[in-house]
C-alpha cells in the first residue's frame, strides 16, 4: 500500500508514474449523455445512471487549475456528447484561459458542429475530433441510429473553414459493417486536410458479444497502408499511443489506435476524469477515485494535487484487455473513450 506524500513536500511539477511516464494530457468528460445510439457504445440510447450530478463549472475550474500546475498541457473535453451541456462554450473558455494549458480539444458526434464551429473556435477550442464511422449514409445510419450524415459532414466543412489547427475524423473499425470503407475514406482524404483516425474496437463490459462479432485488428489496416506507400510519422509528445501515417499524394493523414498491439501502453500520456468527478488512471481500470470532494474550494487544491500524485503510484504498466478484463467501463460513453 502506498502512503500519500506529505503535503508541502511532494514535487508537484509533473504528473509521473512509477514507469517514468509523464502525463501531459487530460481527457475530461463533462456528461454521460449522448443523442446518438452507436451500436458499439450506446445501442439502446443514453440511460441516466443515478442522481449524482455532473461536474459544475466551478468544480471544473478547480480541477483544471490543479492539473495545469502539475504539467498538463492539453485538455480534451469529451462525453457522452459534450455539446449537450448548455455551458459547453463556457467550459471551452475556462479551459482555454487556464494557465499552462496550451491546447483545448473536443470529441463530438458533429450534430451541432455546423452551427457552432466558429463560436467554439472563438471561445478557445483549437482541435476537434468528429466521429464518422462510415462515409456511406446508409451505413452511417445503421451504426449511429441517426440519419444525420449530411449534417455531420457540413460540420466538418465548417470546422475547416473556422480555422481549427487540426480536424480529425474518428472511425471505429467494425468487421462486417464499415470494414469495406477504407478505399472510400482514402479517396476522401486525398484532397481533404484532415486526420483520419481508425480506432480498433475495444471490449467493454456490456459489449462482449458485439466485440466477438465485429472486432477487426488494426494491424490489418496498418499492413495495407504500408503496402500502399504510407510512411509512419515521428511521434509527438502529445500523440500518445496513436501511430500516424502520411503519404505524399494525400492532403490528409491517417492515425491508427490499436490497443491490442504489443507495447500500446508504453507511451501512455493521458489521464481521465469522468463527468461525475472520478479519476481513471486507465480507460479499463476496475475503479475510479473520487476527486469531487476536493473540488469545493480553492484552499483544497494542495490536497487535490497530492491525491493525484499519490494515485499515480497505483497505475499499472498496461491494461489487461488481452485477458478480457475490461474493468469498470461498461460502455465508452461512461468515461469518454
From Swiss-Prot:
Question: What EC number(s) is this enzyme filed under?
Answer: 4.1.99.22
Catalytic activity of the protein:
GTP + AH2 + S-adenosyl-L-methionine = (8S)-3',8-cyclo-7,8-dihydroguanosine 5'-triphosphate + 5'-deoxyadenosine + L-methionine + A + H(+)
Positions that bind [4Fe-4S] cluster 1: 34, 38, 41
Q: Does the keyword Metal-binding apply?
A: yes
From the UniProt record, which GO molecular function terms apply? 4 iron, 4 sulfur cluster binding; cyclic pyranopterin monophosphate synthase activity; GTP 3',8'-cyclase activity; GTP binding; metal ion binding; S-adenosyl-L-methionine binding
Pathway(s) annotated for this protein in UniProt: Cofactor biosynthesis; molybdopterin biosynthesis
Q: Where is the Radical SAM core domain?
A: 18-242
Q: Which UniProt keywords apply?
A: 4Fe-4S, GTP-binding, Iron, Iron-sulfur, Lyase, Metal-binding, Molybdenum cofactor biosynthesis, Nucleotide-binding, S-adenosyl-L-methionine
Q: Which SUPFAM superfamilies match?
A: Radical SAM enzymes
Q: Which GO terms describe its biological process?
A: Mo-molybdopterin cofactor biosynthetic process
**Which residues does the record give as S-adenosyl-L-methionine binding sites?**
40, 80, 131, 202
Binding note for cofactor = Binds 2 [4Fe-4S] clusters. Binds 1 [4Fe-4S] cluster coordinated with 3 cysteines and an exchangeable S-adenosyl-L-methionine and 1 [4Fe-4S] cluster coordinated with 3 cysteines and the GTP-derived substrate.
- Positions annotated to bind GTP: 27, 76, 107, 168, 270-272
- Binding positions for [4Fe-4S] cluster 2 per the UniProt entry: 265, 268, 282
The enzyme class is lyase
Keyword Ribosomal protein on this protein?
Answer: no
Out of the domains of life, which is the source?
A: Bacteria
Q: Which cofactor does it need?
A: [4Fe-4S] cluster
Q: What does this protein do?
A: Catalyzes the cyclization of GTP to (8S)-3',8-cyclo-7,8-dihydroguanosine 5'-triphosphate.
Self-association and partners? Monomer and homodimer.
Which family is this sequence assigned to? Belongs to the radical SAM superfamily. MoaA family.
Please identify the protein, giving its name as recorded.
GTP 3',8-cyclase
